[in-house]
Amino acid sequence: MRRGWRGGLGLSLTLLCLILVCILVIDRPLALLMHRLFHHSPWFLGLAAIGQIPLSFAAPGLVVAAIAGWWGWRPRGRGWTWIAVALAVTIAITLKDLLKQAFGRTWPETWTHHNPSLIHDGVYGFWPFHGGEGWSSFPSGHTTAIAAVAGVLWWRLPHLRWLWALLVGLTAFGLVAGTVHFLGDVLAGGLLGFLTGRATLALPFPTEDRPAR
C-alpha cells in the first residue's frame, strides 16, 4: 500500500513539473500549431465532447440515487461503483471551478463575450481571481470530469483500464487539437480528476460493498 501511494505521489509531482514546463515553454507554440493544422475541425471537437458526458450526468445521478434510497433502494456492488463515480465527478468539477477562478488563465481562442485569447489577440497568461468565463481556461473541466470517472473505475473495474485511459486520452487530444484548451490545462485537469476519483474510494462506503481500493 505504501509503495503504491509513494508511486502515485512521484507520478503526481512529475505531472506538476510537466504542467509547469507546458505553461512556460510548450502551450503557446503548440496551440498556434494546432490552430494552423486543425482549426475548428468537427472531429476533434467531437472527441472533446466525451468529457461532457460525466459533466451532464453526475449531479442528476446523485439526485436519482438519493431519491431511490429514500424509496428503499439499497445499492450493492456496481451500484456503489456508479455512486462513487458520480460523487467523484461532482467533487472534482467543484474543485476545478474554484481553481479556474483562482488561476484566471486566458483561453487559446476567443469564444465568449469577445474574451482576450492567444490566437485572436496574442494574449497569454494568468490573471488570478480576475473572474469571468474568459479567464477560466485552467484547468480543463472536461478532462477533469472524465479523469474523475477513470480515477474510480481504474481500481473498481481494472480489467477495462485500457478503456478508461483511452477515454481520457481522446478527450484531452480533442481539446488540445481543437484549440479548446492548452496542453497544460488538460494535464492539470487530468491530474485533478484522477486524484479526486482515487480519493473518493477512501470514503466510508458499506464494508461489504466498498469500492475496491
Language-model features and meaning:
Residues C17-L24, V89-D97, V168-V180:
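Aromatic-anchored segments of alpha-helical transmembrane domains
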Residues S12-L20, F57, V85-I93, V186, ...:
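Alpha-helical transmembrane spans of integral membrane proteins, capturing the lipid-embedded, hydrophobic core
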Residues A65-A102:
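Interfacial segments of alpha-helical transmembrane regions
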Residues R28, I93-D97, Q101, F194-L201:
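Transmembrane alpha-helical segments of multi-pass membrane transport proteins and ion-pumping complexes
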Residues L62-G72, I146-W154:
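Hydrophobic, aromatic-rich transmembrane alpha-helices
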Residues R2-L13, I119-R213:
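Membrane-embedded catalytic cores of phosphoryl/pyrophosphoryl-handling enzymes
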Residues S41, R76-T81, L157-L163:
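Membrane-helix interface segments
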Residues M1-A65, K100-I119, G125, F129-H130:
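N-terminal transmembrane-helix/juxtamembrane module of multi-pass inner/ER membrane proteins
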